[in-house]
Amino acid sequence: ALFEYLSDSANLDTIIFVRPEEKNSALLAENVIHGDVASANKWKIKADPVDDSGATIYKSFTSVIGNMKKGATVDLDITLSDGVKVEVSGGDNAGLACGTMDENASLAVSLSNSSLDISGKSNAGTFVGKMSAGATLNIDKCSTLTDVNISANNAGGLVGSAENAEINVGEGVTLTMTGSVTGSVTVGGLFGSYTYSKANEKTFDISKFSGMKMALACSSGDTADSAAVGSVFGLLTNSADIAKISITGTANDIITSNFDGTVRAGFYGGIVGRYSANALSSELALSDIIVNVTGSCNALDFGSLIGKIGDNSKAYVSVKNTTISIKNSTSSQNNYGGLVGYADQAFIDVGGKVTVTAADVSANQSVGGIVGKFNKNGVVRLGGETNLSGFYPKD
């Protein structure tokens, strides 16, 4: 790294990297600490493709910033010149902008022109590997990203794992990204794993992410049969006793769940791979969502919204004004649900106008238009208009 420790109060002119040496360290700073600064300083980073050998691939750095310490705040502008490809690897937590954000750290990112391979041991995401409690990521500007490939235990299109963290997308910015996300434990189009434990309501507006069309896959290995894969969250945990998590969209934005079922995973969900909650007094509310499921969903439990609601999870899940279309071949080894693949002690509340379309549905154990299988004490309440006329089993 150029700096071992760097204060967020530092004023930096544009730093142009021609080509870093190949070693497992951060590009700019291993650690950024919070100094005497009221607002974030803008740091401009540019990667040019020219060196003596003519090489254009930046290899083996773990992130631009390795670790943002508690309370640190940075505004990072990253420009990769045409022809530059970045390979971020070697760290426990890997992300192009930052590997690890500690509590209450704040990072604003603008990203221009990018072809990325990002791999971490534990957590990896395009922007950040791991976000701790209260950390905030603001994506102020982002070019269309193509050929982005992410892999780790917990892999996410944006962030590998996060706890009580915030992601904000700038006015007029809609993220558009293609490539692949592959994980051995959790895989998410946005977050590999996300945990929420606060009492106040948390809302995720996923309309800003309708351009995220990453192919989601489980890596082979001993953990495959318990891996959770979802187009927004691989694993979503509500650990509060009374808290509402809302996932909302708009009528014009379609969430594409593009599953690569080469390796059988534990759970596939069109929005959430696996959901876990502490109490029925906490709610997961999904509303105004359009989901198109494509690819081969080779999983033990498949649901077009949630693959599995975890064992011993007393979960309350509401679904309202949602349209689901499962367009390509989908196979589930155990349970297949129009909304939820498998649920233990859950209350599924369906209201408004909900439509599920899927042809040639099959599973080894159970198939259901709403829930594939309840283990025990499960309840489904139907209100409004629920249309399952286009959901039918294989002959």
Features from the language model and the residues they span:
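Surface-exposed loop/turn motifs in large extracellular/passenger domains
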Residues: 1-395
